[in-house]
A protein has these predicted regions:
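Cys/His-rich microdomains that often coordinate metals
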Residues: 1, 14, 54, 105
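Short pre-active-site segment immediately N-terminal to redox-active cysteine/selenocysteine motifs
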Residues: 6, 35, 42-46, 89
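Short cysteine-rich clusters marking metal-coordination/redox-active sites
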Residues: 7-10, 50
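Short Cys/His-rich micro-motifs in 6-15 aa windows
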Residues: 10-19
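A short beta-strand-turn-helix
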Residues: 19-38
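Thiol-based oxidoreductase modules, predominantly thioredoxin-like and allied folds used
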Residues: 21-22, 42, 53-81, 87
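Structural micro-motif
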Residues: 34-38, 85-94
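Non-catalytic, surface beta->alpha helical segment in thiol-disulfide oxidoreductase systems
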Residues: 89-123
Length: 123
């Protein structure tokens, strides 16, 4: 972790090589104000394909950061945000650039490399 960029105020690492957990309070802050692309996994704890993809998504953070911020949003806990973005099936990956959704993919990816390749293809 010592190799990545650090916060100018608290000096903690900005990227931790694992997905950031988003909630209602942090979603707009990270999506709307980010100067780098943000890849969000919309998921739920009861979803089998979501659980199957979780390790690959975790590994994808290490492949994509710091060029892309990787985050997760639990649609059960944050139903209003899921409704706002018309999430109809999970898992759904959405890529945001400058606060705007630029790509979306419903369904589970098998590998971190597949997630990284899909993400990079939309930048």
């Amino acid at each position: 972790m010592g190799q990545g960029p650090n916060c100018g105020h608290c000096h903690q690492a900005l990227f931790e090589q694992h997905p950031l957990t988003l909630d209602a309070a942090s979603f707009d802050k990270h999506i709307g104000r980010s100067h780098i692309p943000v890849l969000v996994d919309f998921w739920a704890p009861w979803c089998g394909p979501c659980r199957m993809m979780a390790p690959a998504f975790e590994q994808a953070a290490g492949l994509l950061e710091p060029q892309v911020r990787v985050a997760k949003l639990n649609t059960e806990d944050e139903q209003a945000i899921a409704a706002r973005f018309h999430i109809r099936s999970i898992p759904t990956l959405a890529l945001f650039v400058n606060g705007q959704e630029v790509a979306r993919q419903a369904g589970a990816f098998r590998t971190a490399a597949d997630i990284a390749e899909w993400t990079r293809s939309h930048l």
